[in-house]
Amino acid sequence: MAESNSWPKRLALLSASMLVSFLMAEVAVRLFTKVDPRFYNDADTQQHISPESDNRKDNPFGLPMGFHTTRTSTEAKHVGFVTRFNRHGMRDPVDYDFAKPADTRRVMLLGDSVVFGHVEESQRLPAALRRAMEKRSDGQKIETPAFSCPGWDFVSYMVLMQEAVSKFEVDDVVVGVVLNDFTGYEVPITEDGKIDVASLARQPDSTLSLTSAVKAVARHSALLTALAWASKGFYARKRTLEPTLAKLTKGQHAFDADVAKLEGGFRWLAKTCRDRKIRCLVMSFPYGPQLEEAFARQVIESWFGKTFSPEVVNDGPQRALAALAAKTGLEYLDLVPVYRQAGDVATLFFDTPEGRIDYVHLSARGNEVTAEALAARLSAPPQPLPTAATDTGAP
């Protein structure tokens, strides 16, 4: 009997010990760790914009990707910066009308976390591009709305573009791609030349899943927040970064099949822009180790622990993209020579909260350099492009 009576006491003691341990860990995390959530995908972003909404079910365009905002404008924090979102789900305080204002040139950007920005609002690529183009515009007003989100890929951009250009009046579309954006992704196109959105229904997120009650606690707990974001970071690396790195270390041949899968999407993009009389440009952001040997060593030692293949370092993926763009009738801007010419390449990239130089996300200077190159291209007449291969949106 005495033994049975001791179990409640033991359980109470164990519970008290666990609670004390949790509280001590919570205090330690708050004192010694800077918990600054970083968005890894649009589900993460949605949770911060409007936690009560679910962007798997509802967003401005009714698509399986994108944002839903329940208020006209919302704010969230991302890698230390306040991010404001308009009613369209863009990281932008301006609520753009679908119709373009008079005497205005509107350049729409599509991209992932690089376009979304790891910098202050005024330092982002859309803002820098607007300033750079206004210097060349002879008084014409410039608008640069941008649909962007951490975790998006080339398929995401095309889905958003199909809907966006049917609603927004635009003059130019710039699609900014990173090497991992086109690794293994193929745009599904129907027989009538449209993107098959229904086939892209979102799969359940494999990152840390919490009940509503635990989420309510986690929202106020630095410890649980840190654990949740560590889980998301691990999953994001396993799902997207490591497969891309495997190709980067194997050589150019590892990208060939993936680049070939883009052809249908590139053809669809070229035809859509041509039919709507929109100028379209694909722009590729390089990985830092491609730019300079000394910087490559610094980045690789900090992040990867492995060396990129010579083909990748020598711009093999970018050359493959340029060839595909020419084949399908798209303008293409390779930022590798732009960044090399800018010099001091380490300053082109964002410094992470952990004190490491990012290998792809741009600093304020990086965005300014990119914007100047892009504005120069867009201010010049379109380059002559082949048209024979762009008659259909289907592959």
Regions from the PLM with identified roles:
Residues A2-V20:
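N-terminal Sec-pathway targeting helices
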Residues L13, M24, V29, L262, ...:
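Histidine-centered active-site loop/cap adjacent to the catalytic His
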Residues F22-R38:
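Membrane-interface motif at the C-terminal end of an N-terminal transmembrane signal
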Residues K77-R84, K100-P101, R106-M108, V114-S209, ...:
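Conserved SGNH/GDSL esterase-like catalytic core that processes O-acyl groups on lipids
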Residues S113-V119, A146-F147, F255-V259, F308-E311, ...:
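Second-shell loop/turn segments in exported
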Residues V178-A323, L330, L335-V345, P386-D391, ...:
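Serine-dependent acyl-ester chemistry module
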